[in-house]
Regions:
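Non-ligating segments of multi-cofactor redox enzymes
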Residues: 1-250, 256-295
């Protein structure tokens, strides 16, 4: 049976790593995405790399998902090359780091998670829902049926309801116009999602976000990545307890389920890295040296 000193040695105190700066980075990026100068400088047509609605009056850049889906409604076949270029560039550089550090809708979910309510974990297999939304609502629906289809991504987008729907409905109310059911439907979806945010961490990011799912595919080969150092692992499970996405970091480092919030780096065995990767798979932990037999 291990004595108290051995238990203490295996459970080090969390380090104050780079993750403590994440709320400040999210706030700074929020100011960038909602900068009024964006429209004045004609930046509104340039796609960003985060999930938000370009219909918001304060939006500075375009939503990459909305732009990509909009190409499907054209009378001729076309590829959103600028969107593809931006996402491949960002994904190849940092992967889903933008989800954890720059996305305004992710920031909203982080703030909601701070409310002290009972929390439950979403099963990992539900993460494939992101690719159902990406292939179905972003690609197939607009190409086959156009923007008028009820399941067109912009017609059910919760970010659109929050960032643009509030303004548009208020404007219609002031002008005396009717509230369209298409916009009201988005508010129902947003309401369900807001309630879910109180009881589980980042439900949109885990289950439905098409952009997060796409960027997560780059995690295994992006220049920025996480490195697991087996020789420094004390099997304290600190990295697991710090991961709100439910990733077994020491076994599945750089998985597509990771938003790279870097909370797991408070454990000394995991650290951010850039450039060449020494080992894509998580190496086996070193077993402690056997005690010498007393004679």
């Amino acid at each position: 049976m291990a004595n108290s000193s051995e238990v203490t040695a295996r459970a080090p105190r969390p380090r104050r790593g780079i993750a403590r700066f994440r709320p400040w980075a999210q706030t700074a990026f929020l100011a960038v995405w909602l900068a009024p100068l964006g429209k004045a400088l004609q930046l509104h047509r340039i796609p960003s790399c985060v999930f938000h609605c370009y219909g918001c009056p304060l939006s500075s850049l375009a939503c990459p998902i909305g732009v990509a889906a909009g190409f499907g409604d054209l009378p001729y076949f076309a590829l959103p090359l600028l969107v593809i270029g931006v996402l491949v560039l960002v994904g190849g550089l940092v992967g889903s780091l933008v989800c954890g550090w720059a996305c305004p809708f992710g920031f909203l979910q982080d703030l909601a998670a701070k409310i002290p309510t009972p929390k439950f974990r979403i099963p990992g297999w539900m993460g494939y829902g992101r690719y159902v939304v990406l292939i179905g609502l972003v690609i197939l629906v607009p190409y086959l049926w156009g923007k008028t289809h009820p399941l067109y991504i912009c017609n059910v987008c919760p970010a659109g309801a929050l960032e643009a729907g509030v303004y548009n409905m208020a404007k219609q109310a002031v002008l005396g116009g009717p509230v369209e059911w298409m916009r009201a439907r988005k508010f129902v979806i947003l309401g369900v999602l807001l309630v879910a945010m109180l009881f589980t961490y980042r439900p949109w990011c885990k289950v439905l976000c098409p952009l997060g799912g796409l960027l997560a595919l780059f995690n295994r080969f992006s220049i920025f990545h996480l490195r697991f150092k087996a020789e420094e692992c004390r099997e304290c499970n600190l990295c697991r307890s710090r991961c709100s996405m439910g990733v077994k970091v020491e076994k599945r480092v750089n998985t597509a389920d990771c938003i790279r919030c870097l909370e797991c780096t408070t454990c000394g065995a995991i650290s951010p890295a850039a450039g060449r990767r020494t080992n894509q798979s998580s190496p086996k932990r070193k077993s402690p040296p056997a005690r010498a037999r007393s004679t």
